[in-house]
Amino acid sequence: MTQHKRRVAFAATVAGIALLAAGCASGTAEDTSGSTTTESATETVEGRIAVAYEGGVAVLDPETLEVVDEFASEEFIRLNTFGDGKTVAVTTSAGFQMLDTSEPALTDLVFEATTAGHVVSHEGNTVLFDDGTGTSTIVATDAFADGYDALPETTTYTADEPHHGVSIVLEDGELVTTLSDRSGAVALHAHEDHWDEEAMSADCPGIHGEGTAADEAVIFGCENGALLYADGEFVSFTAPDEYGRMGNAFVSETSPIVVGDYKNDPDAEGYLLNAVTLIDIAAQTYEVVDLPDEVQYTFRDIARGPGDLAYILASDGQIHVLAPETGELTDAYPVVEAWEGPVEWQDAHPAIKVADDIAYVTEPAANSVHAVDLTTGEIVSSVELDHTPNEIAIS
């Protein structure tokens, strides 16, 4: 596989740079929450499951899958892990609404966004990206440790133009974010009233998705391969096909190997995919592995789990276990009935999320959610909901 390395200067001006000082942060001190802290809030319940359905969201117990509570919302919402063990960011037309899964309560706290997009949590910071303005809002991941009385202080960075982008803050405070023309990414260091550029690459057309692997290596998907940021430099990986799109990275912060989705036909109908990308960030190698015909999946159907293995919830109804080091499928666990790919990406179809050794799998055709022990393949609990599950998130 071809790879090339490049470092490019970045001279574009930055619009809407926010001061980092607390007094100039964009968070408001005004109390806008309908959920106040109570004595019971000190006994935080972590790891609950949020399941979106048409017109609302349910909170499930992670062991029994019992529905703890349900909350009305908009017709279509998305769910994003905030990173603190209890909060889920619910994507609505108003922005990012905070769901407290511990209480539980769908609070009135909303980080306003014109087009709420990706949410990335890493090393104590959570970044909310507004596609409609190109603004990254940086929030301390533990901001709601004492309750949801008010929106916390934030820091913001706004790109030159609105775009469907994503950002991450590294352990040293460095912000890595997509370029506004979606041609690549830039790494920035924050100062009191500006951001200094560390590195930039414009070698990633159609940049989409983000993941952080071992040694804090950040990977992005491109329409011609992938883009890696590590040790202050960008490295580009070129796909074997002229159009070879990786749109999502499935990573483990203890593994040097990234598993990505892969599409090589821009005109293909539907959303089912039949190959994966394997990127070894240590060896800096890139490989595309074709899967058996029956192993087809969408962007919701791959997760990393025990042993840093990859788990693919395929359209044949099984979870297929993939060894990233070899690209081989080593096992398969029947979980749901066989299913067809969605007509639109927003349509409800099976999804998988993993916490420790347990995979949580939605089965929209049966209005069900299943918990699967990935070390044995055993379904340890199931629940039938009153609604059709769509997206799922682990708090």
Where on the chain are the PLM-derived regions?
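Blade-level signature of beta-propeller repeat domains, shared across WD40, Kelch, NHL, RCC1
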Residues: P364-S395
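Bacterial signal peptide processing site
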Residues: A25-T28
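Repeated scaffold domains used in trafficking and secretory/extracellular systems
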Residues: T36-A41, S73-K86, V110-N125, T155-D172, ...
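Acidic, serine/threonine- and glycine-rich low-complexity intrinsically disordered segments
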Residues: R182-D301
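C-terminal motif of bacterial Sec signal peptides marking the signal peptidase cleavage site
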Residues: L20-G23
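A short beta-strand motif characteristic of beta-propeller blades
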Residues: E63-A72, D100-T115, A145-A159, W195-A202, ...
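Short beta-strand elements that form the blades of beta-propeller/WD-repeat-like
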Residues: T44-Y53, N80-Q97, V119-I138, V166-D181, ...
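Long, acidic/polar, low-complexity amphipathic helices and coiled-coil-like
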Residues: T101-G221
